[in-house]
């Protein structure tokens, strides 16, 4: 049996956490031969800690052979001790009448503290995925608060946007989603992100040629993917939790186990490619192997695409400037 991998999950008793933990414990994220120890962080209030205890009881009751141990805590340094993987799911949701800038600042406090805790106690090669919104900027804050860790260890989740876009293309083409490759989602995990199928193929054939409808692209496809989260809240009365958890599993599984040459979208610190300033955490096409990701470089960016990329970058830079005074 392999040595257990330590996985931290924050916001562990929340909706996404509840949809995520059982799948991690069953081996869906790191492999069916990889034992895991779950290190679970929740808020210190009584209600959150009681809910966490209940979730841990349920995890025990599943008798997962791969679940080698659990820790439940309200202390980030306990949750992050010696971890290999961190899923930062917990974030302050936007309350009624709350301005976006207030939300940014509230979350900046959380992710500054969590970045510092990771810096202090996590393994030096820890893989960090930020799910809690605003995910790109929260990941940037955590990265900047962990100066002793490699910035490449910090990523933001754009896989939900990527999967949503795959599904919309599959519906449009009437073709199975599994045959679609080389889709890209550029930018921020927000309604400004840009799903781009110019390079995508379905069973090897160009999707751009098959659809060949710029009106559908600009008027239906891009806004449908961008507003999908809001549409789910409207329909369900709650935000998308199971699909977000599924995307987190996909993101980490591909990062750790490899994407087998397939392009996937990850929010990663820019190296200056595609005119994105260095260090900005931005959705890019990547391939992954041996626990490392590599940017897909030198894709041509046409005027239509540049407009969308500029817009999502402007939003990210605005978010970054809103929290820069907290980062020294």
From Swiss-Prot:
Substrate binds at residues 94, 100, 133, 164. InterPro entries: L-lactate/malate_DH, Lactate/malate_DH_C, Lactate/malate_DH_N, Lactate_DH/Glyco_Ohase_4_C, Malate_DH_type2, NAD(P)-bd_dom_sf. It catalyses: (S)-malate + NAD(+) = oxaloacetate + NADH + H(+). CDD domains: MDH_chloroplast-like. One of its GO terms (molecular function) is L-malate dehydrogenase (NAD+) activity. It is an enzyme of class 1 (oxidoreductase). The active site is at residue 189. Its EC number is 1.1.1.37. Belongs to the LDH/MDH superfamily. MDH type 2 family. PANTHER family: MALATE DEHYDROGENASE. This is Malate dehydrogenase. It comes from Xanthomonas campestris pv. campestris (strain ATCC 33913 / DSM 3586 / NCPPB 528 / LMG 568 / P 25). The gene is mdh.
